[in-house]
């Protein structure tokens, strides 16, 4: 069968080496085999790579939950409502530059799959400069606008002062948050998920210790209330970012750019163009999600503090439900990108199948106990005897199952983006959120009341999954490119085009993920 595309058909696959014979490789220092995602069995490799990502997400969620317990239990429902509103803004800000970091990560992963260290370092230098400049500009622009944005969201008056104080301090922390996330994602693109996990552990440890000290003014420290939680976030991320940079320098990491090589920080405009053309659509996906979250929060706010507090508590619980899908999707994206760079297309498709199977196994295993025991888990985030508890349980019963659908979408689009196909996932997400979720909730509230908001979650997640599977099956994502190059291999028409079937092709329990 003829290969699609302008170049030759894939070279023969050598199962002994795990890569295509005849592929030119750029010389690079010996690599730790644990960081090479182009070799080994798919299941164990995906599991080993995804496990630290899952651990990192667990740590971040536990950290957020611990902070929510301190704030909700000791500062009251208004303070918890303030955090829920401010965190939606923070998610929007993270989404604004997420795409740039993700595009850089895919470029690094593809270069490492080709064993092209020089290109990986060029990508890191250019994207670090671009990423830093954008994040600083966003933080500077956000500081004077925090109160107006919170008011536009309809933040309850009782929660507004808390949310404003918290959000202003978070804006100061944004550059540190962004740069730490960027370095972590870059290392994962190079196949190292363990190092980002260890430094994230440091972030969480510092934050857990500092939050009560600064919120309540323990010892010589001032009592800062809600602002103390944001100050703790700033200090923890700044300290861990500095530690990570020092570690990279001390280890003389292959991706570390020394002072003598600072010319690599000068923008390579071909890379900048790719970061913008590929990164903006990926960042726009996060922006669409965050805007939809803000729109949903604005609708929830209209139902009063009791419902808003219940929704905030449920969102804390749901962070754990979505972790398997997010970890698997992130692991699949890096793994697929390295294999795309290496020209190993059968491994790309096998990665998607494994990812979808593990999403169903792990997400399903979380949903069941979180329905059965939600009275106790949700009570952790609310004051004792709060009337919000039963509202929160009702929300959870309606919406928690939607994360099975969400997981399939996240995994498939993680693989799809690894080739450089970034616009179709954006279109699908836009249709699901702004064509289904928000209109569904708005249109049916007069009939269903607040239940229309909760039912919009499974409705939109199901639509997104069906569209994602259709694009995976029939879309042209295998022909996409990040940086065009003459030696790019054509995609053979023999590559399987079926969306992974978690029923017909179950994945062995070895490839767990976020």
Each PLM stretch: what is its role?
Residues 2-50, 108-175, 221-280, 336-402, ...:
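Short alpha-helical transmembrane segments in multi-pass integral membrane proteins
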Residues 62-81, 150-157, 213-224, 283, ...:
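Helix-terminus/linker motif at the lipid-water interface of multi-pass membrane proteins
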Residues 80-140, 177-196, 310-374, 406-428:
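Small-residue-rich hydrophobic transmembrane alpha-helices
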